[in-house]
Each structure stands twice: as structure tokens, then as C-alpha cells.
Amino acid sequence: MGKLIFTDRAWNEYLYWQLQDKKTLKRINLLLKDIDRGSFEGIGKPEPLKNHEGFWSRRIDDCNRLVYQVSDGQTEIIQCKGHYDD
């Protein structure tokens, strides 16, 4: 896997899922692996965010999105709970 960086917010959300919902955590981990294989295509319906240039989103489930940015060979996870700017 390439270099993966979590913002403080995203890391706290990731830890939340570890304690609250293993199924959602498993889905997030699957999305992270798929992002490593192809940042802009694959599972979770990857799409660029219209109001945030350079940021992409993938569906975790109906209510939650994984938001990330890829630059210089690294992926920064912005959030993994809620829907975009929640």
C-alpha cells in the first residue's frame, strides 16, 4: 500500500468505527485497499467533489462517505464518517 495519512478528524472517526461498528470498519478497510489499487476508480462509486477541487469521495454506506485527496504518491484521508462536510 502507498503512503496513507489520516487527518486528526479522520483518525478519530476511524477509531470510532473500530469501537462501534465492525461491519463499517471492514468496508472502510476494503475501500482503502481499493484506493491503493486505483485512486479514482473501483468500488464505492468514486467521484470528485464539486466544491472541493482535488478531493474525492467513495460511499461507505447510505449515510457515510470516505473523503480523500491523492497527491505526490500519498493518500490523505479527510473523513470517514458522515456525508461530506457534516
Regions found by a protein language model. Give the residues of each.
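Enriched for short, Lys/Arg-rich terminal
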Residues: 1-4, 8-25, 30, 43, ...
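Short secondary-structure junctions
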Residues: 38-42
